[in-house]
Amino acid sequence: MLAGFTPFPAERAQAYRAAGYWRDQLLDSVLRTAARTWPDHIAVIDADHRHTYAELDRLADRAAAGIAGLGIRPGDRVLVQLPNTAEFAVALFGLLRAGAVPVMCLPGHRLAELTHFAEVSSAVALVVADTAGGFDH
């Protein structure tokens, strides 16, 4: 367990599982299953990209290989500051497949917030868009 992590109360977790809200399935396995079940269905779409589940699955594998190639190891924390785009989905699943722990940051966060998140999480890297919302990173 991560230091400082507070789990859901056991009773609520049990109720969520009983209701089917939680299926004790890793997020990455949900994408793998969807890619096998509905390979040609659209998984994610934004203004510039449209990926099927099979495409997103392949892109996530490529991203994971690239992330590992950069020296990111399983358990490493990585700040993710991306807008709501297809690129976010690729990065998130790539990080999960590489075994990294994504630390989500809002696109509006700036140096002070990112520095704080990096310090408290011991993040080793940052995934950021070149530009987002008119801000040049």
For the regions a protein language model found, what residue spans apply to each?
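Flexible, non-catalytic linker and terminal segments flanking ANL/adenylate-forming cores
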Residues: 1-24
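Helix N-terminus capping/helix-initiation residues
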Residues: 9, 20, 81, 134-137
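Generic anion/oxyanion-binding catalytic loop in active/binding sites
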Residues: 16-19, 45, 49, 103-106
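Conserved AMP-binding/adenylate-forming core of the ANL superfamily
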Residues: 22-24, 32, 40-85, 89-93, ...
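Short proline/glycine- and basic residue-enriched helix-capping loop/turn segments at helix->loop/beta transitions
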Residues: 36
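Structural core segment of the AMP-binding/adenylate-forming
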Residues: 69-70, 93, 97, 101-137
